[in-house]
Structure formats: structure tokens, C-alpha cells
Curated annotation (Swiss-Prot):
The keyword S-adenosyl-L-methionine applies. Its EC number is 2.8.1.8. GO terms for cellular component: cytoplasm. GO terms for molecular function: 4 iron, 4 sulfur cluster binding; lipoate synthase activity; metal ion binding. Its cofactor is [4Fe-4S] cluster. Pathway: Protein modification; protein lipoylation via endogenous pathway; protein N(6)-(lipoyl)lysine from octanoyl-[acyl-carrier-protein]: step 2/2. This is Lipoyl synthase. It is an enzyme of class 2 (transferase). [4Fe-4S] cluster 2 binds at C95, C99, C102. It is found in: Cytoplasm. PROSITE patterns: RADICAL_SAM. It catalyses: [[Fe-S] cluster scaffold protein carrying a second [4Fe-4S](2+) cluster] + N(6)-octanoyl-L-lysyl-[protein] + 2 oxidized [2Fe-2S]-[ferredoxin] + 2 S-adenosyl-L-methionine + 4 H(+) = [[Fe-S] cluster scaffold protein] + N(6)-[(R)-dihydrolipoyl]-L-lysyl-[protein] + 4 Fe(3+) + 2 hydrogen sulfide + 2 5'-deoxyadenosine + 2 L-methionine + 2 reduced [2Fe-2S]-[ferredoxin].
Length: 323
């Protein structure tokens, strides 16, 4: 079965309406599987509600921002937004890649970039009054630098408009372009993050072919080599069919790359068309993996069923800086 493309209209910086073909919620699988309604109690999150959540939702819409909280259907959106924190996604909401776990739209943005986005994002952060922001983006393989210069411009705009705000840059792999990595680092984020996502064996099955296990490790190692003063961070999803030996191998590889902070969480299928969950990892197993991480020398490890790379990122950063 071929992917179902939809046509969307975007306004270019020159005011021209551009039509793009996208696959909503990613390519995923051709044959959707039944929804799993027997999820264990430990991974159920409360529905988003409350005045703070509604206020943030309205502000995001008003300022025309994209958040990974919404685009990736994150189960923690209610908790995070109620506490006034969110992960801002820049460079649009159309990704040039099609990872099998991700619900972000897939297509070709044709080089479109909103030059006003850094200013709008900085204004939103200032108005929200947050002290810590996670900045991430879709993959933009259609851009010469993968969007690194836009990423850096947004970090600088935030720091200029809202002095004192701490910024975590959760970047794409820029196709292994180390100059692009250096461009982002030059904007002085407090944390540089790139997610390994899964173990070596499952990477071809889970991630887009343009991503790579070794490529992510290379990016993280280079970031630490160039800017040892900046904390590096990565994340693993569990429950995709990996073994404990493979989890430990991935953790060791991340430590060898100089990664300071590690998060581990349960993979949850965003739609029936995405990769099925192979196993629901119980909380006690996450506790063991967390202990492994500290034994390996990570400065901070945050592991649990609902943990995501940007979940409680401000607290994780604080813990890492105090060790």
C-alpha cells in the first residue's frame, strides 16, 4: 500500500503560497495493527487540563509555534504544560525523514524557512516566563546546513530577549556534518542533545535510513570534544525488542562518546500504523537500568516508563550540574 499524501499550503517568506505534499503522522507501516488497549497502569498519564495548560495552548497557537509535545503526541503534555514548560520545535512541522516510531509529518519542505521564527520563539519564551527551554527541530535534509544556522539564530534570539533562560538544544544529526554541529555549539546552549533512540541492531528497523547509530555517536563525541564545557545528552526508547545486553552496550557506547546525561523511557506507539510495542518495561527494570547508568559514569540518569528526552529537563540539568 502506497503512502497517502495530502496537500498543505504554506506561506513563503516572500508572501507566496507554496503547496507541499506531506504524509500526515509520518510514513509508518502500510498495514496498521490493532490498537493495544491493555496498557499497564504504570504508563497511563492523566488527560491534559487546567488553566495553565489552556493558556499555553492559546499562546502557542497565537504565536504560530510548533511544539514536539503536540506533534509527537507526547503523553506528558498535560504535566509539562501545567508546570509552564514545553519543548519548542523550529523549522516547521514537516520532516524530511520517516522514522517508524515518530508521528511528525513527513514530506519535502522545499527549503522553506521562516526568518521571523527566531524572534517569535524568543518572544514566546519571554512571555511565558520560563527559565529553561528545550529547543528541537524536524530533520531538514533539504537545507545545505540542515538548519543549523537557523537553530543557532533561535538560541541567540532567546538569550537576547530573555537573559538568564537556559537552553537545551536537541538537534538532528545534520547528516553527520560536524561543521553544522559547531554552528549550534557556537550559540552557547547549556546542553547539546542528540538522541540515539534505540540499540544498534534495531536502528535500521526503527530509524530513517539516513540516520545511523554510529553517526549519532560521532555527532555527540564531536560536540563534547569541541565544547567540553557544554553538557551532552542522549535518550533511548525501550520496548522495541531490544535485549538487556543491547541496552547496556548502547549505554557504554554513549559514555564512550562523552555523553553526560542519559534518559530512558518506554516506547509508546503514537498511532496504530507505527511500530508495535514489543514489551512494556516495568518500573523496577528502569530502576536497574538507571543504576547501570550511574555505574558507567553518567552525571545524571533519568529512567522511567513515561520519561522522554525533554521530560523534566530543567530538573535533570540541575541534578547534572550538582554532581
Amino acid at each position: 500500500m502506497k503512502p497517502k499524501f495530502e496537500t498543505v499550503e504554506l506561506l513563503s517568506p516572500t508572501g507566496e503560497v507554496v503547496e507541499l505534499k506531506v504524509v500526515k503522522r509520518g510514513l509508518a507501516q502500510a498495514r496498521p495493527e490493532p490498537v493495544d488497549r491493555n496498557k499497564p497502569a504504570w504508563i497511563k498519564a492523566p488527560l491534559p487540563t487546567g488553566p495553565r495548560y489552556q493558556a499555553l495552548k492559546a499562546m502557542v497557537r497565537e504565536l504560530r509555534l510548533h511544539t514536539v509535545c503536540q506533534e509527537a503526541l507526547c503523553p506528558n503534555i498535560g504535566e509539562c504544560w501545567t508546570h509552564g514548560t514545553l519543548t519548542v520545535m523550529i523549522l516547521g512541522d514537516i520532516c524530511t525523514r520517516a522514522c517508524k516510531f515518530c508521528a511528525v509529518h513527513t514530506g519535502n519542505p522545499k527549503g522553506l524557512v521562516d526568518p521571523e521564527e527566531p524572534r517569535r520563539v524568543a518572544e514566546a519564551i519571554a512571555r511565558m516566563g520560563v527559565r529553561y527551554v528545550v529547543l528541537t527541530s524536524v530533520d531538514r535534509d533539504d537545507l545545505p546546513d540542515g538548519g543549523a544556522s537557523h537553530f543557532a539564530a533561535t538560541i541567540r534570539a532567546i538569550k537576547e530577549r530573555a537573559p538568564g533562560v537556559l537552553v537545551e538544544a536537541l538537534t538532528p544529526d545534520f547528516q553527520g556534518d560536524l561543521k553544522a554541529v559547531e554552528t549550534v555549539l557556537a550559540a552557547n546552549p547549556e546542553v547539546y542533545a542528540q538522541n540515539l533512540e534505540t540499540v544498534r541492531r534495531l536502528t535500521p528497523k526503527v530509524r530513517d535510513p539516513r540516520a545511523g547509530y554510529e553517526q549519532t555517536l560521532k555527532v555527540l563525541a564531536h560536540a563534547k570534544k569541541v565544547r567540553p564545557d557544554i553538557l551532552t545528552k542522549s535518550s533511548l526508547m525501550l520496548g522495541l525488542g531490544e535485549t538487556e545486553e543491547e541496552i547496556l552496550e548502547a549505554m557504554r557506547d554513549l559514555r564512550a562518546a562523552g555523553v553526560d546525561i542519559l534518559t530512558l523511557g518506554q516506547y509508546l506507539r503514537p498511532t496504530p500504523a507505527h511500530l508495535p510495542v514489543a514489551r512494556y518495561v516495568p518500573p523496577e527494570d528502569f530502576k536497574r537500568y538507571e543504576a547501570w547508568g550511574y555505574e558507567l559514569g553518567f552525571r545524571e540518569v533519568f529512567a522511567g516508563p513515561l520519561v522522554r528526552s525533554s521530560y523534566r529537563a530543567d530538573r535533570v540539568f540541575l541534578e547534572a550540574t550538582q554532581r
